[in-house]
């Protein structure tokens, strides 16, 4: 393998602004030219009444389950509006979906007691049930507006846990048609476009007419962060060139390299 296996290659990342800096760094280190086309935006808008009830009851929870790094940030941003001391979380244990979520939790000097090896919510629930007896324990699932109820249902019905759910952020489609990034994408195209979620795939489809590379521009192949996003690409009819083995910067870089080999 060349020291710069992505030299002269162009890669587009579609994550929300301010996310995926480590992905970009890993790709640039491999020689790629990287541009960003944020197809989604994150808004932290929890239900204040529900949030107040949850924070009032923090000492009652046995586990807090985070399904994303955005959930961690959204929860603790509001947590510290109420409390000034991290010890106010009490003796709760934490479960995280994936290494990015675990990394976000560590930024608050908290360790994850369980991190799912696979990047899907049901795997997190199954691992938690397999390694810990949570029957009759009180669990708080912190999530976003697009997450399905499968994880809370699994924990409640399969593990007989007492489950509360709070949505602390919303993922919304971002229009990029008139942006400089979109104009550059149309003009130059790319070798690879990386999708990090099914909602990013959906946003791309909705804006496909304004994101079509010009004649003579590079026609990109798609790489998915994981199996769920890969399925969304297939269902959308977008040719899939590769899927990362894990939702990490190194795995994304390797998937891009393999897709272009």
Specify the residue positions occupied by each region the protein language model found.
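Signature of uroporphyrinogen-III synthase
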Residues: 1-261
